[in-house]
A protein has these predicted regions:
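HhH-family (HhH-GPD) DNA N-glycosylase catalytic core used in base-excision repair
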Residues: 1-210
Length: 210
């Protein structure tokens, strides 16, 4: 638990459809250890650690957060609840596609699978740019380098979060290219980060796509 954590929040949730928690993430930000998922998030710039695990019988999901205040922990829990798809009802999807000739076998074999999501909109944007038009394994390696070199940590934990938009906006293109990010992608990432960091684009707004 991070050194600045003075508050703890826990919640037990019943997914709307069968859910299998992922086994960590290739970018190294979400980690799995002994059946427990763990990652560092930043809420309003403050570090919060969130953990998730299956409850007894694997029907329920247990979420816990440790951070500077209950309010920040509550926000972090909500973000991970969204990212893990705990409230998604995929029963209609399974009913319609379990016998589909193309994807039916995959649907039947992994009923607890959820679409991959990110708990932070800028994280989703930054990684979408990194993952364009290249192999996913190569993109994940680039993301791990970005997190290792520019990401945020917190005292008391080895977990790391993505860098802020301001940090990426100020990163030299040559540095980003040294992570194996293509030149055009490096420029696009800096430009997108600059728009977010300056406030000209508010990803939390309902009309951010305009």
């Amino acid at each position: 638990v991070i050194a600045s954590a003075t508050c703890e929040a826990r919640v037990e949730l019943q997914p709307r459809s069968p859910l299998t928690l992922p086994g960590g993430a290739p970018d190294g930000v979400l980690r799995a250890r002994a059946g427990v998922l763990e990652r560092l998030l930043h809420v309003d710039g403050r570090p919060v650690i969130v953990r998730a695990a299956h409850g007894a019988g694997r029907a329920a999901v247990l979420l816990g957060a440790w951070g500077p205040s209950r309010g920040l922990c509550t926000v972090a829990l909500a973000r991970m609840r969204f990212a893990l798809g705990i409230d998604d009802d995929v029963s209609e999807f399974h009913r319609r596609f379990r016998e589909d000739p193309l994807i039916g076998r995959a649907v039947r074999s992994a009923p607890g699978l959820r679409p991959a999501r990110r708990p932070d909109p800028f994280e989703a944007l930054a990684w979408a740019i990194c993952e364009q038009l290249i192999e996913f394994t190569r993109a994940a390696a680039i993301e791990r380098r970005i997190v290792a070199r520019l990401g945020r940590g917190a005292p008391g934990t080895q977990l790391r979060d993505l860098p802020t938009a301001a940090t990426l906006a100020g990163a030299a293109p040559a540095l980003l290219e040294s992570f194996d990010l293509a030149g055009r992608r490096a420029i696009a990432l800096r430009r997108a980060a600059r728009e977010v960091a300056s406030g000209r684009v508010n990803l939390a707004s309902d009309d951010h796509e305009r």
